[in-house]
Amino acid sequence: MFEQLRTIITKYVEVKEEHITLDSRFMEDLGFTSFDFMSMLGELEDEFDIEVNEQEAATIRTVGEAASYLEKLTSE
């Protein structure tokens, strides 16, 4: 899940995959805007055939939290 998420992240910000870690924060470390983040969530919904809860997604700060959330949604 982490590797797939890392690849998708690089579509939204100019960061090399190898610089993205589980502890990377979307806004502070990777330079995401709110629009970037919401756009990425839409792509994740399409890619993994899931439905992201916007209130839950608003609490996600790091790549690791996003990966855990995606794993939870894809296992339901």
Predicted feature locations:
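Phosphopantetheine-dependent thiolation modules in NRPS/PKS and related acyl-activating systems
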Residues: M1-F32, L41-G42, E47-E76
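Two-component histidine kinase catalytic core, primarily the HATPase_c
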Residues: D36
